[in-house]
Amino acid sequence: AVGVMASATGATASKYGARRETPKYFPENCTQCMECITSCPDTALPNMAHDLQTILQTAVDNYVTDESEREALRNALPDVDAAIRETMATNAKKKEGESLRELVMGIVRQDENVSQESADQLDGILEILPLSYLKVPAIFFSLERKEKGAGGIFSIFVSDLCKGCGLCVEECGDHNALVMVEDTEEYNAEIISATEFMKLLPDTDQRFLGKYNNETPEDSRPAAWRNHMMVNRNYDALTSGDGACAGCGEKPVLHSIASVTEAYMRPVYHKKADRLTQKLALLKQDGVNLLEKLAEEDPKSYGTWKRIVSHVVMGLGGDSTEDTQIRHDEHGEISDSEAIEAICLVLEREAFNHKNLQSLDGRLANGMSVMAMGAHTGCNTVYGSTPPNNPHPYPWLNSLFQDGATISWMMGESFMA
């Protein structure tokens, strides 16, 4: 028997009813060590870094309802940023001081062009956002010291995918940046609101990734590889939301495999797409002339090439040599321009598939999957194939133990084809 279920459906799950306690993030204590991120079994701690103005602009645009005051706040944001930078740097140097929300709202509430209602709306969203700058020198203080205004804000969002296992709190230890609290309706609403805000933000910019290079990860320093988890496409390489046990020891390994593969292979796919696009342009420009030249210099190779194109690409290949010849005769002579156009269509489709295809609804349109996974008799086969929540956003197959290696190799062959 063969069963099929949709990929990555776990991303839409809620584990609110499955946990009694949820980690609460205290940004003033966070050092951006990333230990909680890599240990979480449920991809429930998405994290990123941004410019302060990017965060404030997003908050104003989406949470302040009065249009005129929204515009006034937009115009005031550069001044707000400039007004609090020195205090932020001083606080970060001594690793204590006011929260970002307190600093921002202290300036905003003095603005006569902003009503109490609009200020409260901005304050309401900033209150629940995880905005860290005090003890994250790689994101804020080191950059700010080199160039005023360059320091960013680090955020760890607690997702509703969390099962409340507490592994992140254990890893955080005495830092107390993550502490387990009772999961009330009010707190659950806060973490959902915060993660919805996160979806409005752009991805982490390269300048906040340190010695990790997002475009050429192979050139990154090994110690900086933890930062690849700050890039959304890498962190979301496994979606979770499945029925694995709370505190599962297998899923952090799966997440590491999937995220590192995504980090390495996605730029490779995009570079391949760019090469194909360049070849496509050259073929459109010179292809017909080159074919004419080939026909003059080597008629046999010219005929073989056109026959291969008509056979493999244009669908004229039959079950036998005789059948193929009949199809060719019925179709008629294929012009050089038709043969070149057929190859161009293949290159165009391949370039699109490698760079712009949206393989799953609701996910980035950045190309087809860079990996597949075969499971055979184990925990992964159970929580991965239990509807409705599948954690795998790539081709995933579950089979009996004796078939797993063979079928997985077949999946691998499909990537090579």
What positions do the PLM features span?
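Ferredoxin-type iron-sulfur electron-transfer modules and their immediate structural context
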Residues: 1-156, 161, 169-389, 393-417
